[in-house]
A protein has these predicted regions:
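Conserved "right-hand" nucleotidyltransferase catalytic core of DNA-directed polymerases
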Residues: 1-30, 37-38, 110, 120-127, ...
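Conserved beta-strand -> loop -> alpha-helix junction used to position metal-binding or nucleic-acid-contacting
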Residues: 88-108, 115-117
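Switch/connector loops and helix/strand junctions flanking conserved nucleotide-binding motifs
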Residues: 77-81, 112-115, 128-131
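Conserved catalytic palm subdomain of right-hand nucleotidyl-transferase polymerases, strongest
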Residues: 7-8, 72, 96-101, 382-383
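Residue-level signal for well-ordered alpha-helical scaffold segments within enzymatic catalytic domains
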Residues: 62, 79-83, 104, 117-121, ...
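Short active-site loop/helix that positions an aromatic residue
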Residues: 18, 28, 75-88, 102-106, ...
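Conserved non-catalytic scaffold segment of RNase H-like nuclease domains
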Residues: 1-5, 10-78, 82-83
């Protein structure tokens, strides 16, 4: 039998990285057991609000304390409730359902586990109200845009981050569509994943771990910024030495980090046995294509060390040092399953469902623990 749940979906201010997370809510869509449709409590929009924040808080607190609740991506919505509305952080896991987990168990190979694309594909519920809201924001909010990608200027002005700036009535139509989709998705996946495939144990495992993963993300990891800073100076000095040595070895001064310039220098010094070409016909300077074809072993060693050093400096050491400014902590997001940011593009989590992390990536656990500071009364594991 399908559990009777209250389906909830928060609309919030724009999402920022931890520790400035989760964002402040401006409204919440609700679909209670037995309801034929959803309602929307709007309290933080510029206009067309229908309830005071304190009254909405009482209603939502009563729901979370007295009945099971359903979200799509409970990690986000439950965190919003805990941070801003006083929800009990120790709410029993049995009372929190998540269609993101069910969608993953239904088919982890699906191109998208996001609510709207999934509901469109399996339930025939196209996101028409999203198009209406998007058009309003692009027309009425100065600077709003719909460009995706990591290199986009002013990502905070992406239309999906500005939903709180739209009128409560219009956002309510959009948000109610999401809770209706979530409830229909719950019924669809519960029948197929739980009743037909017997995967209740797997679903419950993900639910039990939900607050564990969120807790790790919220607490962050303390780092030794002083040591990181000295390491940056040391390894940047080593990188400069490697670049100068490589230039001397090849008989010319050039930017070793530039693929085309490195290829030209290797050619002129007659250091290549052969070139592996890219699909566009250019000489590939990717490590795996370059190293096996260089004639000089000392040059191979220099370029190999440089490649490793650049990777660790950019991916870990500098990133950790920058991200920990003001807090002495880094705040990676820990993920249970793959999920997609339906507004800004990109995804997090692993397709296989294994635990993963991002922003920054901590899958490569440091073997030497001197850069990490253990919390008081706790120990770091030996590796």
């Amino acid at each position: 039998m399908i559990p009777q749940v209250a389906t909830l979906d928060f609309e919030t201010k724009g999402i920022e990285a931890r520790p400035v997370y989760p964002p402040k809510p401006v409204g919440c869509a609700i679909r209670l057991p037995g309801d034929r449709g959803s309602s929307y409590l709007a309290w933080g929009h510029p206009y067309e609000n229908n309830i005071k924040e304190k009254d909405a808080k009482k209603i939502l607190l009563d729901i979370i304390k007295n009945m099971p609740v359903l979200f799509h991506n409970a990690s986000f919505d439950f965190s919003v409730g805990v941070e801003w509305l006083g929800w009990p952080v120790d709410t029993p896991w049995q009372n929190i359902h998540d269609t993101l987990f069910l969608a993953f168990l239904h088919d982890p190979r699906d191109r998208s586990l996001s609510l709207k694309p999934w509901a469109d594909k399996y339930l025939g519920m196209p996101p028409d109200e999203q198009d209406e809201l998007k058009a309003w924001i692009l027309e009425n909010v100065p600077g709003a845009h719909d460009h995706r990608g990591r290199k986009v200027k002013n990502p905070e002005l992406f239309w999906g981050a500005l939903i709180s700036e739209a009128p409560g009535g219009l956002v309510g139509k959009y948000a109610k569509g999401d809770t209706d989709r979530t409830w229909e998705m719950f019924k669809y996946t519960w029948k197929r994943v739980i009743e037909e495939q017997g995967m209740l144990e797997g679903y419950n495992r993900e639910r039990r771990n939900l607050r564990v993963f969120d807790g790790m993300s919220d607490e962050g990891i303390k780092v030794n910024r002083k040591l990181l800073g000295s390491d940056i100076k040391k390894y940047e000095s080593r990188l400069s030495y490697l670049d100068k040595t490589i230039c001397r070895k090849l008989g010319r001064t050039f930017d070793v980090g530039s693929g085309p310039q490195l290829a030209d220098a290797l050619d002129k010094a007659d250091m290549m046995e052969r070139w592996v070409l890219t699909p566009t016909g250019k000489r590939s300077t990717a490590k795996d294509n370059l190293i096996p074809n260089i004639r000089d072993q000392k040059l191979v060693n220099l370029l190999g060390e440089r490649s490793t050093l650049v990777f660790y400096l950019s991916t870990f050491i500098k990133r950790w040092h920058e991200d920990s400014i003001g807090t002495d902590r880094i705040y990676p997001g820990f993920h249970q399953v793959r999920s997609t940011n339906e507004y800004g593009g990109g995804s997090s989590g692993a397709r296989t469902g294994r635990p993963s992390s991002s922003n920054p990536n901590l899958l490569n656990v440091p073997k030497y623990k001197r850069v990490l500071e253990k919390p008081w009364g706790k120990n770091l594991p030996n590796i």
